[in-house]
From Swiss-Prot:
It comes from Psychromonas ingrahamii (strain DSM 17664 / CCUG 51855 / 37). Its EC number is 2.3.1.274. The keyword Lipid biosynthesis applies. The gene is plsX. One of its GO terms (biological process) is phospholipid biosynthetic process. Pathway: Lipid metabolism; phospholipid metabolism. NCBIfam families: plsX. This is Phosphate acyltransferase. It is found in: Cytoplasm. Coiled coil: none annotated. One of its GO terms (molecular function) is phosphate:acyl-[acyl carrier protein] acyltransferase activity.
Length: 346
């Protein structure tokens, strides 16, 4: 197995550095070829590393910096005045080729701006996109992008999202010709504005993309599409609505189970079954949104992620490294754009 090296911004999230360190420990145990560089404040990190016997680990090292980017910092300010932050240093390690990927639970806006500056976009890509997977009752999961990096998109940007999502699905999930759909207010061909209509036409004309039509928001978890394409505004709202409904469902279920002695006894019997059946719906299993379209691999973890969730984010970074996702996207995009040029000259 070839060596893999991941940089982790340990100062990003909402819950302190112990979560990324615990996740790093788990990932090192799972992958004997993995090396991890933790970036952050030595004073805060060393006690945690020593607690979990990681301070002398042969495959883990620490880069010290006093500075971090909080969730409240304006992204533009972070770009101009936080060049020595843990997030920026982790991204620089990727751009310098010293690590294969970067994982951060920090400020999303700052991460996107800093990553675009440090790594640049791939040829033919004007805007990177956030992509993550959602649980799907038929397929196991479905990828959706964009999830908030680009609030407004033209048809060509959405088209590029479809190409990038297809490559990720083809490589990571080993699916030939994955089905691509566009999120819309209806499934009918005439629904949606000019941007969606034009994007649909572009996808129909591209033989290297398996376009499957429009999909509505109520089908996110049941559709037969492997990739759902949308602008960042709609994608972010859809994602957070799903997360909110999941929390409501969980809270109401606990409330119902604890409402009486009978329900508590019944709940004790049903809980193991429910836990097993609903495990694939747990948001921790889907943590880790990749910022694709860049010349390097960057994975954004949820700010409040626990150990399991952050480990999943690291796993995403490992998979994308193993499948060389940026290079694969660049190759596919070159083929698709060449095909479009040929069509325009016919």
């Amino acid at each position: 197995m070839s060596k893999l090296t991941i940089a982790i911004d340990a100062m990003g999230g909402d819950v302190g550095p112990h979560i990324p360190i615990l996740a790093a420990l788990k990932s090192l145990q799972l992958h004997p070829n993995l090396h991890i560089i933790i970036v952050g404040n030595r004073t805060q990190l060393l006690p945690v590393l020593k607690k979990y016997q990681l301070s002398e680990h042969a495959r883990l090292s620490l880069i010290h910096t006093d500075n971090e980017i909080s969730m409240e910092v304006n992204p533009v300010y972070a770009l101009r005045h936080r060049s020595d932050s843990s997030m920026h240093i982790a991204l620089k390690l990727v751009s310098q080729g010293k690590v294969d990927a970067c994982v951060s639970a920090g400020n999303t806006g700052a991460l996107m701006l800093l990553a675009k500056q440090a790594l640049k976009t791939l040829p033919g890509i004007s805007r990177p996109a956030l992509i993550s997977s959602l649980p799907n009752m038929h397929l196991g999961h479905t990828y959706m992008l964009d999830l908030g990096a680009n609030l407004q998109c033209d048809s060509h940007t959405l088209f590029n999202f479809a190409v990038m999502g297809s490559v990720l699905c083809e490589k990571v999930d080993q699916i030939n010709s994955p089905r691509v759909s566009i999120l819309n207010v209806g499934k009918e061909k005439n629904k949606g504005g000019d941007v969606l209509q034009h994007c649909a036409e572009l996808l129909k004309q591209t033989k290297h993309i398996n376009y499957a039509g429009f999909v509505e928001a109520n089908e996110l978890f049941t559709c037969r599409s492997n990739i759902i394409v949308t602008d960042g505004f709609s994608g972010n709202i859809a994602l957070k609505s799903c997360e909110g409904m999941g929390r409501v469902f969980s809270e109401q279920l606990d409330k119902a189970i604890n409402s009486s002695l009978y329900s508590k006894l019944l709940g004790k019997l049903l809980r193991p079954i429910l836990k097993k059946q609903l495990k694939h719906l747990h948001p921790d299993m889907y943590n880790g949104a990749s910022l694709i379209g860049l010349r390097g691999i960057v994975v954004k973890s949820h700010g409040s992620a626990n150990e399991i969730a952050f480990t999943c984010a690291i796993e995403h970074a490992i998979q994308e490294t193993q499948w060389q996702i940026p290079a694969s996207i660049s190759k596919k995009l070159e083929t698709v754009l060449s095909e479009r040029d040929d069509l325009s000259h016919e």
